[in-house]
Curated annotation (Swiss-Prot):
InterPro entries: DEAD/DEAH_box_helicase_dom, Helicase_ATP-bd, Helicase_C-like, P-loop_NTPase, RNA-helicase_DEAD-box_CS, RNA_helicase_DEAD_Q_motif. Residues 64-234 form the Helicase ATP-binding domain. It comes from the Eukaryota. Disruption phenotype: Morpholino EIF4A3 knockdown results in multiple defects in craniofacial structures. Fish morphants staged at 24 hpf show eyes reduced in size, and dark and opaque zones in all brain structures. In addition, the otic vesicle and the midbrain/hindbrain border regions are barely detectable. Cartilage and bone staining reveals underdevelopment of craniofacial cartilage, bone alterations, and clefting of the lower jaw. The third through sixth pharyngeal arches are underdeveloped in morphants. Keywords: ATP-binding, Cytoplasm, Helicase, Hydrolase, mRNA processing, mRNA splicing, mRNA transport, Nonsense-mediated mRNA decay, Nucleotide-binding, Nucleus, RNA-binding, Spliceosome, Translation regulation, Transport. Residues 245-406 form the Helicase C-terminal domain. It comes from Danio rerio (Zebrafish). The keyword Amino-acid biosynthesis does not apply. This is Eukaryotic initiation factor 4A-III. GO terms for cellular component: catalytic step 2 spliceosome; cytoplasm; exon-exon junction complex; nuclear speck; nucleolus; nucleus; U2-type catalytic step 1 spliceosome. It is found in: Nucleus; Nucleus speckle; Cytoplasm. GO terms for biological process: dorsal/ventral axis specification; mRNA splicing, via spliceosome; mRNA transport; nuclear-transcribed mRNA catabolic process, nonsense-mediated decay; regulation of alternative mRNA splicing, via spliceosome; regulation of translation.
Length: 406
């Protein structure tokens, strides 16, 4: 399938030059300023407006029409700009509701994100009688098989469970017209790469592929050659990916132990709205949660080792505002939409700079203001400077009046 591919660059660059490459949006992409002028079906438009959307965001104005046309699309957009709705609207528009077979497959890196995509599809497709199932690990296989046998127009899921269902012949692929890879940078990272290829091999040869992410490292664009045909690119320059409207600060802590005291001092500030605290390991999340509770602070926590049911109820509590401070690993950083979150604390700086934007992109969604505070030990200074340089941004020392900025 991947034969005629637009060359992404003219010459082979040495590794260190890669960071300077800027990818522009393809010339044939036009802007459609309203949902009404996108040629969408009436029952879908009703769902869009009922969901509370009024005007399409920048990525929606550019990508939806191209996806509906059937083009393979690489779309890059900041966290919090409506990426999920971009492909959900496009998928719903392309369905034949009369045909009770899976016509679109959406892969996501985490169970939570797949579950959220399913919710958005069902909400936007509320007037269409759409059947949509989230196919995710950590849930009952029998339930998946039953739901898939019933007939689902769209399946959203994590690559491992989706491939399992295809192998068991519960998920039939013959009617699939579209494959969407959400948070593709994370998915195509080593962990999911093989599983995506496994899934892809079972899809009909003419399947349309859409790849969506906030960051597109160079290796990802190289990989798109393998399963995209003449893709249209809707990309923002990386320098614009500093999340505007988010004030970023650091707190210098000489030793690891001091981070905890600093966090306790900040607790009253955290609960002004809602806050997410990121740690790099599951053990650290458990340790910090316990330590905060021992000091009589109310916090909830989440990471990938917790049972699915528990993760869901924690998310629900946090979404409803019942819990105000969530301690998590990067499982949370990918595309989860909680609009009240206006403060992010990196208790540990992320292990790679791409994750930084996903973490702080959690706060200030849809142009809301937000604050990110990084706890920095002496040996983290270099990483912080690297992040600053990579995103052409400035991270200042935290002022005393940080509470006034939230």
């Amino acid at each position: 399938m991947a034969t005629a591919v637009v060359p992404v660059r003219k010459r082979i660059l040495k590794e260190e030059d890669m960071t300077k490459i800027e990818f522009e949006t393809s010339e044939e992409v036009d802007v459609t300023p309203t949902f009404d002028t996108m040629g969408l079906r009436e029952d879908l438009l009703r769902g869009i407006y009922a969901y509370g959307f009024e005007k399409p965001s920048a990525i929606q104005q550019r990508a939806i029409k191209q996806i509906i046309k059937g083009r393979d699309v690489i779309a890059q957009s900041q966290s919090g700009t409506g990426k999920t709705a971009t492909f959900c609207v496009s998928v719903l528009q392309c369905l034949d509701i009369q045909v009770r077979e899976t016509q679109a497959l959406i892969l996501a890196p985490t169970r939570e994100l797949a579950g959220q995509i399913q919710k958005v599809l069902l909400a936007l497709g509320d007037y269409m009688n759409v059947q949509c199932h989230a196919c995710i690990g950590g849930t009952n296989v029998g339930e998946d098989i039953r739901k898939l046998d019933y007939g689902q127009h769209v399946v959203a899921g994590t690559p491992g469970r989706v491939f399992d269902m295809i192998r068991r012949r519960s998920l039939r692929t013959r009617a699939i017209k579209m494959l969407v890879l959400d948070e593709a940078d994370e998915m195509l990272n080593k962990g999911f790469k093989e599983q995506i290829y496994d899934v892809y091999r079972y899809l009909p040869p003419a399947t349309q592929v859409c790849l969506i992410s906030a960051t597109l490292p160079h290796e990802i664009l190289e990989m798109t050659n393998k399963f995209m045909t003449d893709p249209i690119r809707i990309l923002v320059k990386r320098d614009e990916l500093t999340l505007e409207g988010i004030k970023q600060f650091f707190v210098a802590v000489e030793r690891e132990e001091w981070k905890f005291d600093t966090l306790c001092d900040l607790y009253d500030t955290l609960t002004i709205t809602q806050a997410v605290i990121f740690c790099n390991t599951k053990r650290k999340v458990d340790w910090l949660t316990e330590k905060m509770r021992e000091a009589n602070f109310t916090v909830s926590s989440m990471h990938g080792d917790m049972p699915q049911k528990e993760r869901e109820s924690i998310m629900k509590e946090f979404r409803s505002g019942a819990s105000r401070v969530l301690i998590s690993t990067d499982v949370w950083a990918r595309g989860l939409d909680v609009s009240q979150v206006s403060l992010i604390i990196n208790y540990d700086l992320p292990n790679n700079r791409e994750l930084y934007i996903h973490r702080i992109g959690r706060s200030g969604r849809y142009g809301r203001k937000g604050v990110a505070i990084n706890f920095v030990k002496n040996d983290d200074i270099r990483i912080l400077r690297d992040i600053e340089q990579y995103y052409s941004t400035q991270i200042d020392e935290m002022p005393m009046n940080v509470a006034d900025l939230i």
